[in-house]
Each structure stands twice: as C-alpha cells, then as structure tokens.
C-alpha cells in the first residue's frame, strides 16, 4: 500500500503562514538599495565589415549585407581564467558558448553569449579547433585584442533561483562536461544559486556562502536524471540489495512499505528548488537511523529532560490491552476494522504489523501536539520521510549515525553498513547528521542545532511557500 499524506485544513493554514512570511521577507528585500557594480577597464570600438568606422548602422552597402564588428581591448595581468567557453556554430564560426557569472569577461561586460569571434590578437580564428582557441585564450597575457560580431538577440535578466543539491558532484570526474576547469564542485545539501540555465544540459551556478564569487558549470536536472537512469538501466538486474530493511527484526514489515521502497529506488533526485525564509519554529523533530543506533535512548532523554517542549505521539494498535495498560497512555487501542478504515482514509503517517497486530501513528495525533505549541518527536523509517517533509509538519530531520570510536566488532560493522545504506539513499532529506558517540554529547549537539534552526534564517523547499 502506498503511503500518502493527508490534505487537511491544518496543512493549508500552515502553508499560508509560511507564504505570508516569505512575502514579507521579499518586500523587505525590495526596499533595500541595490549594490552598484563597476566594470573593469575595457576599450571597445565599433566598425563594419567593409572597414568603415562610421557611427551610423547601414544595413547594406552596394547590395551587400554589412555586419557590425566590435574591437574589444583589455589587459590580462593575472592567471585568472577569462571565464568563457567557445563553440563552432553551424557555419563553423567561433562563437561564445557561455560566460561564467563572476568571471573576468562577465565583470567586464565586453562579450555576450552568441557573439562571434573573428580575431584574437590579430590572428584569424578560421580553421582552428575549439580546443586550440580555448588554449589560446587561456595562455594569452598582457594586452588582449578581440574582433567580434555582437549577437543582436535580446539578453535576458539574471535569474533569482536557488537549488539544494541532492547529490555530490566533482567536475574532474565527469566525462560529459565540456570543460572540466569550468565546472563547479558541490556536495549534497549545498545551496546553489542558479545564474544561467540557457543551456539545456549545463547550467551555471555558485555555491551560496562560498568565497569563490565566479560561477561554474553544473549538470542540469534533466542531464543528471538521464545520467542516473542510464546507469541504473546498465546495472545488473540481479544486483543484491544493500537495504537494511529486508532483514528480520522487530516490525520487520513495518509500514507495509515494500512498494514505497521500490519507488524510492526509481525516484531519481538531482536538485530541489528552495527559498530562504526568516526564522520560524520547526514543529516536528524527526529522528532517522539504522535499527540499534540509539534513537530510542535519544528520544526518551529528550522527553524526560524537556517534557514541556517535546511530546511523543501516542501510537494506535489493534493489540489487546494488558492489565497494567491504560487506553491513550502507552497506546490507543482500536479494532482491526477501525484501523483498516483509518488506513484507507490516509489518516496514518506510518503503520505496520508485529506478531499479527497492527501499529501506527496518526496525523491527527501529531497535529494535537502542535496545537499545544509543543514539538512532536517522530522516530520513523526513512521511507516515510517523503510524507512528513511538508510545510504542514515543518520537520527538522536528524540522521543518527553509529559511533566511529571503540572496537570494530562484527555487530558494529553491520550497524555501520546499514547506516551507510540509509545515508546513501536518503541523505538529501537530512537537515543534520550526528555521530552517536554518546547520548549526552549527541543530545547537546542536537538541541543546539534545533534551537539554531528555529532562531535563524532557513532554506526550505519552495513547495512549503507556493
């Protein structure tokens, strides 16, 4: 059974609250004066292909088309790359393929995408390969003179788009990238400002907060998803699964998520569009980790130390109550028929069975905790992350990894293997990763990070706002 999130009224109200917060943030930004950038010293002079430097712009001379040629001169005194890539168009003319945002040429504003280069320092570029021309541009120093025919097409304004990377990328290891030196290296979770996406395969971006101002090439979502899908198709069909959820353990068929797991494996990820919001309170703390990593100890410690702040939602079960159990305290006890009806109505965010009895956590239970202005703690399976990662629940997702200290026993090695399997498939959902070298240390780091997330600007999925 595929798990689905409910679409109740509370979800709509939370969505509106974050939308209003974002709108207020945008209005405040628009009221601030924009910084003015000053271009580098560049000399340009217009002429025409008949050699005339006349100020007019004749369309034809004696029945022949006359194209405007621009002479561009500037001095290159450092080893800094110019920040452009070249290509040959259908007429085998050398044109500017892309200009890297923040690079030397971009700061000058002297060239634009589509400009045709005729000469480099007096040398005609005809009959030269792109590699030869790129090398010439890279190695040239001192005064540089270019003759170009400007591209007359309109130029679009700069983009204002931010994406969270959902995979690690190293351009030096990419055989598809047209220029490895122009690539941008990033890691899962990095926020990338998208500068240009004119090329359907290679976008330009820069990592937010990086000291490097110039942009670099990154694979577009379409290219990355095609790449991953192609690799998956070429992989052996009988490859063994590294998922830790197939082994026998408590709640071995928890959440009936085998179909969800299959779809997770086919769900190719690349980037997630995000927006930056002012500080707001996260309503749910989600703990993710392999079985035996210590999530229960951490959860129980949070509940006992901060009962006024954190609450664990009481689960529902079809198991008969024991003599010492009180309905609504450890469990809500319901019939199998009622629970089956509730599952069909998508009232459970997760559910499963153990020893013939069904267990599950309802959305409504979590909502009731939020209405008390408290934070709900969930220790769920990773397959459920898609369902809880919404504006309605506003989760802060923490991955708990096993200790990397002490003796490497067989059990610890298996735990580390299971943990890595979860990380490799779901890391793009994590807000924080912690190594559990001790409950006290982990608790301190977790609470500090959670408080920091609730009191400072945050990057959230654009779906939380729009």
Swiss-Prot record:
Q: Does the keyword Cell membrane apply?
A: yes
Q: Quote the Pfam families the UniProt record gives.
A: Guanylate_kin, PDZ, SH3_1
Q: Where does it primarily localize?
A: membrane
Provide this UniProt record's keywords sorted from A to Z.
Acetylation, Cell membrane, Cell projection, Lipoprotein, Membrane, Palmitate, Phosphoprotein, SH3 domain
Residue limits of the SH3 domain? Answer: 158-228
Q: What is this protein called?
A: 55 kDa erythrocyte membrane protein
Question: Which GO cellular component does the record give, naming just one?
Answer: plasma membrane
* Modified residues annotated as Phosphoserine in this record: 13, 19, 52, 57, 110, 243
Q: What topology does it adopt in the membrane?
A: Lipid-anchor
PTM comment: Palmitoylated.
Locate the Phosphothreonine modifications and list their residues: 49
Q: Where is the PDZ domain?
A: 71-152
Residue ranges of domain Guanylate kinase-like in the record: 282-451
Gene name per UniProt: MPP1
